[in-house]
Amino acid sequence: ESLKNDKGNSLLIAGSNNPNVQMLVNKINYQLGNYGQTIDTDNVIELYKGDDVEIEEFKNELLSGDLDGVIFYGSNPVYSHPEGKQMRDAISSLDLSVSFSEYMDETASSCQFVCPDHNFLEAWCDHNPVSNHFSIQQPLIRPLYNTRQAQETLLVWTGSATRTNSESEAFYNFIQKYWLDNGIGDQAEYFDFSEFWNWTIHNGFSNSQNELTQEALVFNDVALGSSNNDASSDWEFVVYQKELGVGHHAANPWLQELPDAISKIVWDNYITMSPSDCYKVFGIDDSNQKSAWDGIHLGQEEKAFVAKLTVNDIEVKLPVYPLPGQKSGTVGVSMGYGRGENNEDIGKAAYQCDEFGNHLDNGDGGLVPIGANAFRLCSFKDGHLSYNGFGNISATNERYSLAGTQTHHTVMGRTSIVKETTFDFWKDNFEQNQEAYNPKIKLHSKEKGAHVEKDATEYSLWEEHPVENVGHRWGMSIDLTSCNGCGVCITACHSENNVPVVGKDEVRRARDMHWLRMDRYFSSIEDDNRKNWAKAKHEGDFNYADLEIPEENPSVVFMPMLCQHCNHAPCETVCPVGAT
């Protein structure tokens, strides 16, 4: 009803690759009047243009022996395809197999030839992420190793270019000629192509003025097909993507140590489920909410429970993180983990370590991957890759240590930590609200033998340093309404300031060294019942212990805590939602 009453101001998103689900969501958005309001059809997103049907056809031809050779660029199907293990054996038996992977990943390890590509920081390239927007990727450094850009290699192999040396500009010249021949960008605005090209390189992009011809949107009442999900099992699972991505960056310690936006867990993969489901699966008495919440453990002070998720014949065993707000009967597993399970050389950060920082041995001389490969749970249905389905969950007797950067999970007093109100209320009551929403901190001291109380801003550890005449000074405010806790600012700060990565065990000891912290708070089951923050002044039936228990479907608040001493802060410029 709330969507109907506020037409044109909402947005429904399909969490499935199933065309029937997407058409249904599109029809609902149409009925709600969202097209032309919250949905812009004039700007076409050109990202993720893969074709699931072609991938499935390739897999079938590969497994049936109908292929003689294959070249892999920017893909790793042995890891990311549900039937990757079968594909690995088939690739090894081909007459020709080539990979352009930067390192010996799961697919490259099965190929006859590996021609390592430049890192993207070492290479020229061009991109068209959105219609009429074309950008240029420039190398920041010369290649560190003896690598060759994949595009240039293909040009040489096809006889379209000649490689001169390691600093060959064959692909750069190809890009330049392609832009000239095809009229890419706003070339008509410049005197000649040379001037246009120099400005494009300088600015990094060029926008085309060509008007796109969009076909008219037609929504009819044709019956949609089934979603084809087999609901014979009790649990619905979802394979989702978080900060680590789809697996390309599993060896990046910055991202491994970046706390998940919601769970705040680092260096691990896990199964998420609602707290109420945790009580049932692990046999925890929930008659007392506080003892039940304490009993499911968050894996920091005590080891987390471990569960086994079974989908068809695939089993995944992972620690469990109880996630407030998750729908009962569902579980979530993140993709991007479980790299290098066949002893491939993914990178040191992709494998588990003991408390002393030494890699764990799998018993066969190899290393133990972090987490499990969730792509094995996916399946192809009617030509599309499905990231959700149904399976079974069972408890195990095992326990596992998780590392989190935050163990206090609720606001514990919304009025004292998070100041929330509407702009109109704030504006209409500005004089009164200045003190109410941002109270001044008082400090107590003695002056001339008498007790005095002053604002904290009147005290300083340092000698007086006037700043009135120093000109512009850096300062930053953060719109908490826009902030979604993604953590991009944390990694930018980590990189800019060469902050050490300490590893999982040190994070468990609360020794993480991030200069910027992203706190996440859930609303508490008792928060609305408290009349006053001061316990002595509180009136009515109220339990302070229950403030530690999140609501079943809580509100979520993100609050960054910054270092407050950076004059050219990268956290300001990288925010993807413009909250800074």
Which ranges hold each PLM region?
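Long, well-ordered, tryptophan-enriched scaffold segments
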Residues: 1-16, 27, 34, 150, ...
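Flexible glycine/proline-enriched surface loops and loop-helix/loop-strand junctions
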Residues: 6-9, 134-141, 262, 554-559
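Gly/Ser/Thr-rich loops at beta-strand to alpha-helix junctions
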Residues: 17-21, 77-79
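Anionic-ligand anchoring segments at beta-strand to alpha-helix junctions in alpha/beta enzyme folds, i.e.
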Residues: 23-57
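Feature representing long, continuous alpha-helical segments
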Residues: 26, 56, 60, 65, ...
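A cross-kingdom feature strongest in bacterial/archaeal respiratory oxidoreductases
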Residues: 43-47, 56-144, 160-163, 177-518, ...
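Non-catalytic, well-ordered alpha-helical segments in soluble enzyme domains
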Residues: 149-180
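Ferredoxin-type iron-sulfur electron-transfer modules in oxidoreductases and energy-metabolism complexes
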Residues: 464-474, 504-561, 565-573, 578
